[in-house]
């Protein structure tokens, strides 16, 4: 059908919004971490007698959505005719997403398969999007081979770079670095101007003790010419990983000057690494005040403050995360 990009997976890296860190034992925050190095669900903080965890955030934010979806799904799927397959597909998809976010991975796999069953053989952007979710649920449920098969089916259909990359991550998790490297190489050959793809490859390789080889990918990414504010932001992230904080600040400033709010978050991280907590807080606050920060960003900012020993500020971030 000539489709190259699944729904929600526009070039430039936004597909990371729906995938996860396969190298983390628990999968990482749902819908956030495709790369190693981010905060995982295992992080738990006890401050003044209160427990803050990724799971706390997930349950608070998603419990009502899951309950509502269960009710809607039950109502829609018990009395619908053949003309309601599109509604059924959307209901199963949403139910599957909520199951993932609440740790019911087997139920999620079943829901996504039922969503696909409503398509009656047609394959479009929505079906590919559901396949990505299904592969995620399969991996998290422990069905690693099933996840590989699902990514392979996507690759057979349209050779999408996202699927190559994610399958490569799973091969690394299976200790099959040769196949993983092959998939990473193919992913970049299909989409060689995606900064986040280079970042993802680096962090996965670094996670598995191949840091020097990973840095080669970062060096290659820096050979690309920045064209957009997002490009400058991603270059800033790369310079940060390479320890070149001055260049990181310069690139991130360009992104901020072009009104890319998210760049404030990464600027805060740079100053955190430089030990300049005042500047770090200034940029974190700008990002927080923008209203664009989500629960996972706030938890990461809280973790940074925990690492820095500024517990009162950490509590503020954690509490703000709970309120979203």
Question: How does the language model describe each region?
Answer:
Residues 94, 126-129, 133, 140, ...:
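Canonical tetratricopeptide repeat
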Residues 75-79:
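C-terminal motif of bacterial Sec signal peptides marking the signal peptidase cleavage site
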Residues 101-102, 140, 173-174, 207-208, ...:
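Register position in tetratricopeptide repeats
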Residues 118, 122, 156-157, 190, ...:
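Structural marker of alpha-solenoid helical repeat scaffolds
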Residues 90, 124-129, 162, 196, ...:
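Start-of-helix register in tetratricopeptide repeats
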């Amino acid at each position: 059908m000539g489709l190259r990009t699944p729904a929600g997976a526009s070039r430039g890296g936004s597909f990371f919004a729906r995938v996860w860190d396969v190298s983390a034992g628990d999968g990482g925050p749902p819908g956030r971490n495709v790369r190693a190095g981010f905060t995982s669900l295992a992080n738990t903080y006890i401050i003044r007698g209160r427990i803050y965890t990724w799971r706390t955030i997930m349950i608070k934010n998603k419990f009502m959505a899951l309950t509502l979806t269960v009710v809607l799904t039950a109502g829609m799927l018990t009395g619908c005719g053949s003309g309601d397959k599109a509604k059924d597909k959307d209901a199963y998809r949403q139910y599957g997403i909520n199951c993932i976010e609440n740790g019911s991975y087997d139920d999620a796999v079943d829901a996504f398969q039922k969503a696909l069953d409503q398509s009656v053989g047609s394959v479009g952007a929505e079906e590919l999007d559901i396949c990505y979710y299904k592969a995620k649920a399969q991996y998290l449920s422990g069905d690693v081979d099933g996840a590989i098969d699902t990514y392979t089916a996507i690759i057979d259909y349209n050779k999408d770079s996202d699927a190559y990359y994610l399958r490569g991550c799973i091969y690394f998790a299976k200790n099959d670095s040769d196949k993983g490297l092959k998939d990473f190489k193919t992913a970049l050959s299909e989409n060689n101007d995606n900064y986040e793809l280079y970042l993802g490859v680096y962090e996965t390789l670094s996670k598995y003790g191949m840091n020097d080889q990973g840095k080669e990918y970062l060096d290659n990414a820096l050979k690309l010419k920045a064209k957009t504010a997002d490009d400058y932001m991603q270059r800033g992230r790369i310079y940060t990983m390479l320890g070149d904080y001055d260049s990181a600040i310069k690139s991130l400033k360009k992104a901020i000057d072009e009104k890319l709010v998210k760049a404030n978050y990464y600027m805060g991280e740079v100053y955190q690494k430089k030990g300049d907590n005042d500047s770090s807080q200034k940029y974190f606050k700008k990002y927080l005040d923008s209203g664009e920060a989500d629960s996972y960003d706030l938890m990461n900012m809280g973790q940074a403050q925990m690492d820095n020993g500024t517990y009162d500020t950490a509590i503020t971030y954690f509490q703000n995360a709970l309120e979203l």
